[in-house]
Amino acid sequence: MAAVFDLDLETEEGSEGEGEPELSPADACPLAELRAAGLEPVGHYEEVELTETSVNVGPERIGPHCFELLRVLGKGGYGKVFQVRKVQGTNLGKIYAMKVLRKAKIVRNAKDTAHTRAERNILESVKHPFIVELAYAFQTGGKLYLILECLSGGELFTHLEREGIFLEDTACFYLAEITLALGHLHSQGIIYRDLKPENIMLSSQGHIKLTDFGLCKESIHEGAVTHTFCGTIEYMAPEILVRSGHNRAVDWWSLGALMYDMLTGSPPFTAENRKKTMDKIIRGKLALPPYLTPDARDLVKKFLKRNPSQRIGGGPGDAADVQRHPFFRHMNWDDLLAWRVDPPFRPCLQSEEDVSQFDTRFTRQTPVDSPDDTALSESANQAFLGFTYVAPSVLDSIKEGFSFQPKLRSPRRLNSSPRAPVSPLKFSPFEGFRPSPSLPEPTELPLPPLLPPPPPSTTAPLPIRPPSGTKKSKRGRGRPGR
């Protein structure tokens, strides 16, 4: 993993290969002089005219001028996310998502700077069909730019909000793709730590992509732990809350909370404020609705084990243990990885520029990248050395061997009211929480009696949480930097 944005990219001056022998005078002798001496070079050769276009050919010069702003996709405290079209250089006309971060806001805190570095490095190094791809990265005097593949299917949150709850086969598909993505991150020593519906995007074909790697932790392999308090409360594992040290098992707790959310309409532990929500996560009872199948019930309970060593996926097997659970018995994992399994929902898009799956609060705004007039100190700019990056080949490096023409299957919809959005409580990694001394260490608690079954007239499972007629603002939605 590159450190502090360090990348081995060729510059316009070229790069010298290490260990290559220097040319002798004879080797460097021009071809014309060899022929004048009556000598012909041995083997194949090619005469190359030295011009500005044939010498010092390096990575494409990339900058804001290469992109036309089309729409605003998101906005947050650190900057904006735009839909853009490339108007210069290679991939002319291609649509991307451009994340713009303000340096001045990031460098105020060392941990924000470190998390920005981590996100940049992870996006550059991790290639997987279910992880968003970085195409370019560059910077100006006051801003950082990440050019990502544009995922026009929108957030999984939007679709979950629209449906209310998912049927188990629908949830199984999304959970399986997320499992493969998490397993790949873990194999690289990376903990994701912010799994939630808002950070899961859908491609135009309907497959998931994990996004927003600002809270990831690198270099956490088997046996290592970290203690940073970060994430979104409703999906955070109890060992993060009590600060007992955590490892990659926290991602499996979050996946269990997400699974519960998909199947019931809300995360497993919620309350009217942060403190009570935390208390419930640490020592609350888990209530499972009766309409869940035995396999779904069993997997949720194994994901939400409070002891990380007893949690499914928490052992050396990691994702492989999750994949072997009976809930996924009908899943062909090789076909899933190759995009040969039909998604349960395929976004209805009119064109590459279609933003109908995004929040209209943002897409209706006029896209403007404000002037870059911030002057940072030399020491502040040192934090972003080596940020620039151009992908060796856009898309091809992660798509070899995969089929990208899945068959269209009509989505199965529920006749339930729209789900009232959860308000994720996004904490900065340095914001502390000290649990009450009365709270015990996390232990597995028995389940309460089953909830009463849905009314006989119901044609589909009902969410546990009653739908609300008013929408709550979704804190953290569209936050490009964190």
Curated annotation (Swiss-Prot):
GO terms for cellular component: cytoplasm; nucleoplasm. Phosphorylated and activated by MTOR. Phosphorylation by PKC within the NLS in response to mitogenic stimuli causes cytoplasmic retention. InterPro entries: AGC-kinase_C, Kinase-like_dom_sf, Pkinase_C, Prot_kinase_dom, Protein_kinase_ATP_BS, Ribosomal_S6_kinase, Ser/Thr_kinase_AS. Residues 67-328 form the Protein kinase domain. Residues 1-26, 407-482 are annotated as: Disordered. It is an enzyme of class 2 (transferase). This is Ribosomal protein S6 kinase beta-2. It comes from Homo sapiens. The gene is RPS6KB2.
